[in-house]
Amino acid sequence: MTSKLLQPIQVGNLTFKNRIMFPPLTTGYEERDGSIGPRSLAFYTRLAQGGCSYIVIGDVAPVRTASPTPKLYDESQIEMYKKLADALHEHDCKVALQLFHPEYDVQGVGKMIMEAGIAGQLAAKAKAANDVEEAEKQQKICDELTKGAYAKLHHDMQHFVTEASVDQLTAIKNSIAQCARKAQKAGIDAIEIHGDRLLGSLCSKLLNHRTDNYGGSLENRTRYALEVLQAIKEAAPSMMVEYKLPIITVNPDGSLRGKGGLLEDEAVEFAKMLDAAGIDMIQVAQANH
């Protein structure tokens, strides 16, 4: 096992020096605007120095959003990702961006949460100044915004996949493809398609209740994910592309764990579809959204 772990492996057009990979996760080390700052750069560089051959930066949003994750939506952000790629390449470590659409920030949920925070701060200042009336006023605003934001948050996560228009889905697909183009320009080696969240929800018979070409049969429910893959390959043809494939598993008591993904039998069929569409690698994961 150890000898295999340290052997090189070819995936798509990339050769990894070994099989040690750092999987995607949200570190919280990014700057407030989602940029890759000194703390993020140092964290990932240490992993590369330690011998890791492949690092996937998790939850990179291709749009401006309040989501506390990395972001790459503007040409001006390319340079910071180039610095990251250059730093990791110095240690013969490849780097990928895991792209996802922050569906829980649909139509300004994040803005409502931020405005609630501001009102809360104003309430605290008024209270400290013994201005009871102003404190109560701002606290009421804070409470109402918070309640409304989280009600909308719950609705969006549960229903956006079914309610989104084809135009919305097309815009999201295009933003992901353009993000991949920017990543390629920055010298990033690969793209991981986040198959959980929005894409997993579209694939899921538990969450997808659409009646158009994106709902119903397995072919329809997986159509959008395959369109996203094709859009990325067209926008960034030199990049290796992998897919995070979430599996809905069955608990010992018979209940299901996860909703945004596919049950095992459908997942096998979808993996074959991905292979036929030209995917380079599949990362199998537990469905958890």
Report the location of each language-model feature:
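Flavin-dependent oxidoreductase catalytic cores
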Residues: 1-289
